[in-house]
Amino acid sequence: GLGDVYKRQLQQEASRRLSFQARRTMKTAQELYEGVEINDMGQTGLITYMRTDSLRISDEARAAAYDFIRKKYGDKYIPDTPKKYKTKGNAQDAHEAIRPTHPEVTPDMVKASGVTSDQYKLYKLIWERFIASQMSNCLMDTVSVDISANGCNFKATGYSVKFDGFTVLYEEAKDDEGEKKNVLPPIKSGDSIKVRNLEGNQHFTQPPARYTEATLVKAFEETGIGRPSTYVPTITTIINRNYVERDGKQLKPTSLGEVTNQLMSEHFDKIVDVKFTANMEKSLDEV
């Protein structure tokens, strides 16, 4: 969900939506955090600290988000109870989630101040996701449609939107086109439907896709490897040492990487075990 607006999701969403590599995302986030020149405000830090895996936001920030939502979209887009997102157990919660420091400063205002293209794009992403995370849910009905034509039966399944909620502002990007929701238009029993075209598809079971920077960062978090502050340096290091190379957006092991992995697995199996790193992080937290 939208609650993970923050931490590794920043790197993932910037990769999916903006085609930013993780290093570029964190460099730009650092600039937004340290401050840029904004019209009538001077040098202004636009986002909170970005090396955090917290999902917590302050009551003041939530109130500022509600103020904007109410003026722009109306009361029905404000949820009945405030949305509070839980941070995972191994997360460091010293800072708030990554959010705009001044929610009233819209992306258009930032753009008009002459910031760089990267700064504008990343701020827009953070700002829209933060505002959307505090909006009402999108309500959808699951729909199954049976269609009969010339004695042949066809079936379509998908969703119809009852209330757009936060999606009026923001929809989460997906790595895979197939993940996107199949939204069907409003139809009722007995309606006639025009056939635009017929397409025959044959599907084969696909092997798992190679990691992109975004999906690798997600895997780091899900398995408990590292912290948001170490994700980018880790990826950069394995590329710089020629263990991994980029193939478009995907990351693939080099022959050196494969040999290194084989030797490490044979002789240092505990160290390359994913659980070893996660448990080490947990043990360090408990000290």
Briefly describe each language-model feature range:
Residues 1-287:
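Core catalytic DNA strand-manipulation module of type IA topoisomerases
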